[in-house]
Amino acid sequence: MLRAVSRAVSRAAVRCAWRSGPSVARPLAMSRSPAPRAVSGAPLRPGTVLGTMEMGRRMDASASAATVRAFLERGLNELDTAFMYCDGQSESILGSLGLGLGSGDCTVKIATKANPWDGKSLKPDSVRSQLETSLKRLQCPRVDLFYLHAPDHGTPIVETLQACQQLHQEGKFVELGLSNYASWEVAEIYTLCKSNGWILPTVYQGMYNATTRQVETELLPCLRYFGLRFYAYNPLAGGLLTGKYRYEDKDGKQPEGRFFGNSWSETYRNRFWKEHHFEAIALVEKALKTTYGTSAPSMTSAALRWMYHHSQLQGTRGDAVILGMSSLEQLEQNLAATEEGPLEPAVVEAFNQAWNVVAHECPNYFR
């Protein structure tokens, strides 16, 4: 079964490549995901990246392959994983799909990350070990985008960056990315890389959604100044912005998900599971009903439309939203929402009011 699904995924990738035109040898610069075209002079919307954190956990290999196929068949082509996702199963599943990741003529782009957790570090040996292990799992010679997943405050950053430069020179990754770093750390890293002639970071992956906007104050201006594009994770606040939860649910038995039943559950509950967040969601839900009546979009749709049309993401700068999922149905619903138009002004204002309700306890974007 998996073999058949894998072949289907590979065929989808070929069709995607065909739509993109003949294959050509690429220089050492990453091809970005095709962003949605502007309609009638509207601003270019942010791109969409497939987040694969649940592959190997809530999604088995067959279900994972089906979601990748559905994603590619929409003409999208960037996949995001990490060394640590599901103890490496996410990378292994992606590597088993026969996509030809990392080859010169592959139009499907892959990103992974090295982290400083669970006995790992960002010391040179650990960075190399993590990346080379990821390449083996992904069955590819190089990744298109290699992130430092979070700061390692016990390792001098210059050592980490030197290691990244060496790995880049060896052809093991194309672009360097940062995630969960403070804005001052981004400035320090960029300056160090530039002064030493090392590969410059070009992408930052950070937490951003309609009720988690801390990045707007300092980080986004920093990224604009240094020319990094921004990829937003947690666009639905781990699922809280779907509106399917109630604050009292934390005290009862819940099905497995971001907030319950896994090693990251406590982190996500500490991040988003707060009374003010539920009050903020109620404000938006009321505005949706008042504004749209019986044709009101779902809370999920509204939250994603806010990201694509009303946030500070800019498609012209190559910004993107990372869409995760725990099923094919969920992915298809989320992708449909990304193609919908802007929200009515009253709902946008309700989202602003919601942000004001939770701003005082917004989780930090850095670690």
From Swiss-Prot:
GO cellular component, one term: cytoplasm
Any single biological process term in GO: lipid metabolic process
Residues that bear Phosphoserine: S40, S263
The entry's keywords: Acetylation, Cytoplasm, Golgi apparatus, Lipid metabolism, Mitochondrion, NADP, Oxidoreductase, Phosphoprotein, Transit peptide
Note: With 4-nitrobenzaldehyde as substrate, it exhibits a substantially greater specific activity with NADPH than with NADH. Conversely, it has a 1.8-fold higher activity towards succinic semialdehyde with NADH than with NADPH.
PANTHER family to which the protein is assigned, alphabetical: NAD(P)-LINKED OXIDOREDUCTASE SUPERFAMILY PROTEIN, NADH-SPECIFIC METHYLGLYOXAL REDUCTASE-RELATED
Subunit annotation: Homodimer. Heterodimer with AKR7A1.
Protein name per Swiss-Prot or TrEMBL: Aflatoxin B1 aldehyde reductase member 2
Organism: Rattus norvegicus (Rat)
Gene that this sequence comes from: Akr7a2
